[in-house]
């Protein structure tokens, strides 16, 4: 609790008919957004939907090649059909730049890091939220149960165990490899807030 206890927060308010209700589920980050995690989540959520209440479910694949493979094998379609939002490969949930939980919200997430602002971005103004780290499968099971906290072990799921196939074309088509082909004559474009290195004296032989 922030502000020396001045903010009143309790998970008791999240209990509905004896079950704990979650406001937000996230599968994200370079670890949480792995191919196997998201495929398993899609297997769990397939044919179900997350409901139209306050609960939200977002999935961030760990990389663009992983994202493309999930599109090819149908996992993205299953997730989107359920009501999940599948976003681009982005570190936002880890450092508070994406899907920051709302005030008094309870968020469950399989993500990699725990930076400031991840649990609410305005603590100094009295905002507070609760975040629990959880495995991707149980987050998907909770989403399939419309936001009521549910372990994946409670569901009978046939996991497809799909294999990942890396496709390098994404990087080959978009990322410039300058190794061995550098061209000093190409002018580097600078924005108004970026300046060149200041002129520096070379280091002497002995400091």
Residue ranges and their predicted role:
Residues 1-207:
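Fe-S-dependent hydro-lyases/dehydratases of central metabolism
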């Amino acid at each position: 609790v922030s502000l020396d206890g001045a903010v009143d927060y309790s998970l008791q308010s999240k209990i509905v008919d004896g079950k704990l209700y979650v406001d937000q589920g996230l599968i994200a980050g370079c670890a949480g957004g792995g191919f196997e995690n998201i495929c398993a989540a899609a297997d769990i959520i397939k044919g179900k939907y997350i409901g139209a209440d306050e609960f939200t479910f977002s999935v961030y694949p760990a990389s663009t090649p992983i994202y493309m493979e999930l599109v090819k094998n149908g996992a993205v379609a299953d997730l989107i059909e359920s009501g999940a939002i599948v976003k681009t490969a982005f570190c936002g949930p880890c450092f508070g730049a994406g899907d920051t939980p709302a005030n008094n919200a309870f968020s469950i997430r399989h993500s990699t890091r725990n930076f400031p602002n991840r649990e609410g971005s305005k603590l100094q103004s009295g905002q507070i939220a609760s975040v629990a780290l959880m495995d991707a499968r149980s987050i998907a099971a909770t989403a399939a149960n419309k936001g009521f906290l549910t372990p994946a072990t409670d569901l009978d799921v046939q996991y497809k165990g799909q294999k990942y196939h890396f496709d390098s074309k994404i990087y080959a088509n978009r990322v410039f490899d300058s190794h061995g082909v550098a061209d000093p004559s190409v002018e580097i474009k600078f924005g108004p807030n970026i300046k060149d290195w200041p002129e520096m004296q070379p280091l002497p032989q002995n400091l």
